[in-house]
Amino acid sequence: MSGVAKNLERINLKGCTLNINRVHSRARGRCDAVSFNGLAFVVAYDPDAADGIKSQTLNSLFFLDAKLAEVGSGKEALLQTTVYLSDMTMKAEMDEVWCEWIGPRDNWPQRACVGADLGDDVTLIEIVVIAAQI
């Protein structure tokens, strides 16, 4: 966790100091990752909005790997994952890429997959995770 402190905020709330690390997004008003008290909260997406769910899933997972590393975590420490798909008929294709990436059974988090309007016609997937810091 030594590389985590670069974005550290110390917030005093009712006499208690909270150490919160925020990894700001390119988008205004949000972070790609936040860590606090040994937990990391990360959102991943394909910044390039590649064609097809397999490409967007792979790019989102590369993005997730990078953001997890920024907050001192990794896929082996995932606790909970929610995958949002713009079209649930793409779930089987997404699962192929996910299963290849996640690796052995010891890495498997609790996971849900939900159909959602992702706000535009090009974004096919967003992945939201909670992970332990390692």
Label each residue range with its predicted role.
Residues 1-79, 85-134:
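N-terminal presequence-like segments and the immediate start of the first folded domain
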